[in-house]
From Swiss-Prot:
HAMAP family: Ribosomal_bL33. Belongs to the bacterial ribosomal protein bL33 family. It comes from Bacillus licheniformis (strain ATCC 14580 / DSM 13 / JCM 2505 / CCUG 7422 / NBRC 12200 / NCIMB 9375 / NCTC 10341 / NRRL NRS-1264 / Gibson 46). This is Large ribosomal subunit protein bL33B. GO terms for molecular function: structural constituent of ribosome. Disulfide bonds: none annotated. GO terms for biological process: translation. Keywords: Ribonucleoprotein, Ribosomal protein. GO terms for cellular component: cytoplasm; ribonucleoprotein complex; ribosome. InterPro entries: Ribosomal_bL33 (IPR001705), Ribosomal_bL33_CS (IPR018264), Ribosomal_bL33_sf (IPR038584), Ribosomal_zn-bd (IPR011332).
């Protein structure tokens, strides 16, 4: 079952991205390196509720 999640920047707290994930294969929180427009560089974005 795929669910929609939002990804928030760990440094600014901005919620920049919306994506989907499969809860059965990835039960833990997703963590990706994505571009942060405010900082103008790539940072770690974590899944938020």
């Amino acid at each position: 079952m795929r669910v929609k999640i939002t990804l928030a920047c760990t440094e600014t707290g901005d919620r920049n991205y919306i994506t989907t994930k499969n809860k059965r294969t990835n039960p833990d929180r997703l963590e990706l390196k994505k571009y942060s427009p405010r900082l103008k560089r790539h940072t770690i974005h974590r899944e938020t509720k």
